[in-house]
């Protein structure tokens, strides 16, 4: 068995988290390499392991990405996370809709394919403003990451530039969510390995606020409201898939006195290894390792 850490051409061998995982598994006696995904398809053999990591940018060519994933499955490659999790997690609107029984940021589908004029796009968005009872929306593609085509749309301001970009990309499906002012205080993320919540991360992605370094938070120190949502999510995942994902990150946003789930990351979640204690990094890596040697 060989372990491949899947990366992209731009990032292969350059991401600290990838390098740490590679070295950790080499130290356990495994053959482990960081390789771009399209090359892994060519060289991997049945029962090898592929961990999706710095494949950032897959959303730009997601159909090709899904074809590559299917080719891995056809070759009987062990994928982290497993195939069904990847297919479920790729479309934000679809998976968030399935989680609507939880405290998820209200999410509406924004389809612009049939529009011809900027005024039509504006009217559709204004209707969503009304439906969600908010002046300000966050708009982003259903399949996206890292702030790609993500806009803050305030109906009281001039939005010509945003509407123009939406019009240029109207072939994409978008989601619209109410903008939460508390985003400026950062997001709280929880990293879960094999169904066990390990630690939290206070993060400032820099999309609608200043970009700052993330900070580590012990899981025991996280708010009870977040722990409750994690428990409900675990029940859902176990019921739907029969197993927990090997690697999961759940991003929360503060709302008044509680918290909302903003996203659930299962495809290539950043685990923020560079910001957590060595002992926790070693624990997380070992737990991931156990998921593919059993």
Task: Label the predicted regions.
Residues 9-112, 116:
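Conserved N-proximal alpha/beta basic substrate-recognition cap immediately N-terminal to
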Residues 148-236, 253, 260:
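Phosphate-binding site of ATP-dependent enzymes
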Residues 8, 55, 112, 142, ...:
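Flexible loop residues that form catalytic
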Residues 4-7, 73-75, 84-185, 227-231:
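Active-site nucleotide/adenylate-binding loops and adjacent lid/helix of ATP-dependent enzymes
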Residues 225-294:
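ATP-dependent carboxylate activation and anion-phosphoryl transfer catalytic cores
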Residues 16, 151-153, 275-277:
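Short, solvent-exposed loop/turn segments at secondary-structure boundaries
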Residues 1-2, 48:
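Nucleotide donor/acceptor-binding cores
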């Amino acid at each position: 068995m060989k372990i491949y850490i899947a990366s992209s051409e731009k990032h292969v061998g350059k991401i600290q988290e990838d390098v740490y995982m590679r070295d950790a598994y080499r130290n356990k006696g495994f053959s482990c390499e960081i390789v771009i995904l399209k090359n892994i398809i060519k060289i991997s053999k049945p029962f090898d392991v592929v961990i999706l990591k710095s494949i950032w940018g897959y959303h730009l060519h997601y159909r090709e990405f899904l074809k590559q994933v299917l080719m891995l499955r056809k070759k009987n490659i062990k994928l982290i996370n497993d195939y069904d999790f990847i297919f479920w997690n790729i479309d934000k609107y679809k998976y968030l809709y399935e989680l609507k029984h939880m405290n998820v940021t209200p999410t509406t589908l924004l389809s612009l394919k049939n529009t011809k004029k900027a005024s039509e796009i504006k009217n559709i968005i204004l209707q969503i403003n009304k439906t969600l009872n908010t002046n300000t929306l966050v708009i982003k593609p259903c399949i996206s990451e890292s702030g790609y085509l993500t806009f803050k749309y305030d109906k009281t301001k001039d939005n010509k530039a945003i509407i123009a970009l939406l019009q240029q990309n109207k072939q994409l499906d978008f989601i619209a969510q109410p903008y939460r002012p508390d985003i400026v205080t950062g997001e709280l993320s929880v990293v879960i390995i094999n169904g066990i919540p390990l630690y939290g991360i206070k993060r400032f992605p820099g999309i609608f606020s200043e970009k700052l370094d993330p900070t580590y938070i012990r899981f025991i120190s996280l708010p009870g409201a977040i722990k409750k949502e994690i428990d409900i999510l675990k029940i859902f995942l176990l019921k739907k898939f029969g197993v927990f994902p090997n690697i999961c990150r759940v991003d929360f946003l503060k709302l008044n006195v509680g918290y909302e789930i903003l996203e659930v990351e299962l495809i290539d979640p950043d685990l923020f290894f560079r910001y957590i204690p060595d002992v926790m990094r070693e624990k997380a890596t070992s737990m991931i390792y156990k998921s593919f040697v059993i």
